[in-house]
Regions:
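Short capping/connector residues at structural and topological boundaries
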Residues: 12, 33, 206-209
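Covalent nucleotidyltransferase
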Residues: 14-153
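Short, basic, glycine/proline-bearing loop/turn elements
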Residues: 1, 150-162
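Amphipathic alpha-helical
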Residues: 160-211
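Flexible, active-site-adjacent loop/turn segments at secondary-structure boundaries
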Residues: 5, 26, 199-202
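Phosphate/adenylate-binding "loop-and-lid" substructures adjacent to NTP/NAD/dNTP-binding pockets
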Residues: 1-14
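Generic structural "secondary-structure junction" signal
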Residues: 9, 94, 133-134, 203-206
Length: 212
């Protein structure tokens, strides 16, 4: 079953309680991507073959991404050992942050050519920032990513800053994210994952968003 990812509200929608555990990540200007293991779903394999499972990637609306085979290939052995984990992140490349359309055009191809696949392999990365698990707090989910999800040239862990104690501290980190070329910042509370738009996840792109 394909899960819907958690979506963010603007920071201005509801005040943040900095007495709780608060986390900040850079906001990526990428393509939302959920990756999970699906058992017995590959009709292209010989029925006598033992392994009819596959790793599948899809958008926030459930549309399958067809042109990231290089990422799915690297993740399949890991998913075979972790079949119930669902990764949440974005297809992104920080070196292409000023050419967002390039990533979009590559990942949206439903019938990619050999050249399209080569371009995607060179340019498209999966940046993982959460796992879809409605039983764990964000701190637990973040720790799982750091300790278990593989990292390489095309699978990246999104950095997480924890222990945010005040709005001034949050703004300072947000300013640093902007200076590093990110679209903005994502603020997370230490709550369980919600497969809907949730105040557990807030976004702001500039200081006006935070102060509105």
């Amino acid at each position: 079953m394909r899960k819907k990812p958690m979506l963010a509200y603007p920071v201005s929608d509801k005040p943040i309680n900095y007495e709780d555990k608060i986390f900040i990540q850079p906001k990526l200007d990428g393509v939302r991507c959920v990756i999970q293991y699906e058992k017995g779903f590959n009709p292209n394999l010989d029925p006598s073959h033992d392994d009819r499972s596959r790793v599948v990637a899809y958008s926030r609306t459930g549309k399958e991404w067809k042109n990231i085979e290089h990422i799915l290939f690297l993740l399949k052995p890991w998913f075979a050992l972790n079949p119930n984990v669902i990764l949440d992140g974005e297809l992104y490349n920080h070196d292409l942050r000023d050419d967002f359309e390039k990533i979009i055009s590559l990942v949206r191809k439903q019938k990619p050519t050999a050249e399209d696949r080569l371009d995607a392999e060179k340019l498209t990365q999966f940046h993982c920032y959460d796992i879809i698990d409605e039983t764990k707090t964000f701190e637990e989910r973040s720790r799982f990513i750091q300790q278990n999800v593989p990292r390489n040239h095309c699978i990246i862990h999104v950095p997480t800053t924890q222990g945010i104690c005040s709005e001034d501290q949050a703004k300072a980190i947000h300013k640093m994210n902007l200076r590093l070329g990110y679209e903005g910042s994502i603020v997370r509370t230490n709550d369980k994952y919600a497969c809907k738009r949730s105040h557990n996840l807030r976004k702001f792109k500039d200081f006006h968003d935070a102060e509105a």
